């Protein structure tokens, strides 16, 4: 039997995996158990009462985290003309059309978000097999296909995150760093959950928010008592 590490022992001693933690207690515990030397991300996993196999129960969208993600977001934008200048001014790292598409086809993937104006989707469409599997394909529902590319760049830089239910009906997303103040993590989670509630499909029946869990990159998952959130 493998020996438990010091951190694993601490987790086993301090975490009750059968308990639903109040948000304040959960974040404090995640902070206490974060002993690695890099700034861990706080990840949310939200189990939804949907049938993801049915197209009328798909859940996807975007939310702006009030305190950002703690991550420097690099943005690629497909547009041209005055909109290209505006995108660059807003902080986009990569702006172009066919030239940018050729870079991506050549293996350049040094970005976290892809934004396109509607007219540019004829170019972006050819990149579906590259961007799609990585969750980077622009989509009107997440605000990444828009005439206002500069505004979308600003939103992405300010901490807007996209969400999409996976095959198990679970939303996964980073909501900040463990070094954030407790209240910042709480308010970021509340913003995500609030927008998830707005995105509830009309066809979804029964309990929609079935379970909310928080974890850090290297830490345990803690179930959150939903009554401790202002949602």
Curated annotation (Swiss-Prot):
Gene3D superfamilies: 3.30.190.20, 3.40.50.790. One of its GO terms (molecular function) is structural constituent of ribosome. InterPro entries: Ribosom_uL1_bac-type, Ribosomal_uL1, Ribosomal_uL1-like, Ribosomal_uL1/biogenesis, Ribosomal_uL1_3-a/b-sand, Ribosomal_uL1_CS. Binds directly to 23S rRNA. The L1 stalk is quite mobile in the ribosome, and is involved in E site tRNA release. This is Large ribosomal subunit protein uL1. One of its GO terms (cellular component) is cytosolic large ribosomal subunit. Part of the 50S ribosomal subunit. Keywords: Repressor, Ribonucleoprotein, Ribosomal protein, RNA-binding, rRNA-binding, Translation regulation, tRNA-binding. It comes from the Bacteria. HAMAP family: Ribosomal_uL1_B (MF_01318_B). GO terms for biological process: regulation of translation; translation. Belongs to the universal ribosomal protein uL1 family.
């Amino acid at each position: 039997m493998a020996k438990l590490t010091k951190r694993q022992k601490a987790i086993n001693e301090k975490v009750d995996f059968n308990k639903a933690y109040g948000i304040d207690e959960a974040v404090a515990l995640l902070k206490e158990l974060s002993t690695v030397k890099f700034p861990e991300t706080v990840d949310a996993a939200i189990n939804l009462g949907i049938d993801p196999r049915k197209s009328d129960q798909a859940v996807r969208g975007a939310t702006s985290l009030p305190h950002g993600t703690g991550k420097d977001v690099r943005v690629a934008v497909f547009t041209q003309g005055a909109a290209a200048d505006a995108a660059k001014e807003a902080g986009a790292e990569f702006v172009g059309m066919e030239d940018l598409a050729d870079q991506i086809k050549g293996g350049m993937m040094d970005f976290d978000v892809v934004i396109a104006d509607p007219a540019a989707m004829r170019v972006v469409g050819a990149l579906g097999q590259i961007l799609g599997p990585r969750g980077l394909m622009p989509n009107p529902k997440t605000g990444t296909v828009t005439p206002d590319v500069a505004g979308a760049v600003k939103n992405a830089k300010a901490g807007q995150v996209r969400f999409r239910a996976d095959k198990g009906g679970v939303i996964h997303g980073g909501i900040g760093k463990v070094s954030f103040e407790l209240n910042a993590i709480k308010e970021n989670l509340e913003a995500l959950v609030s927008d998830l509630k707005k995105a509830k499909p009309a066809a979804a029946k029964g309990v929609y928010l079935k379970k909310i869990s928080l974890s850090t990159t290297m830490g345990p998952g803690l179930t959150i008592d939903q009554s401790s959130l202002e949602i």
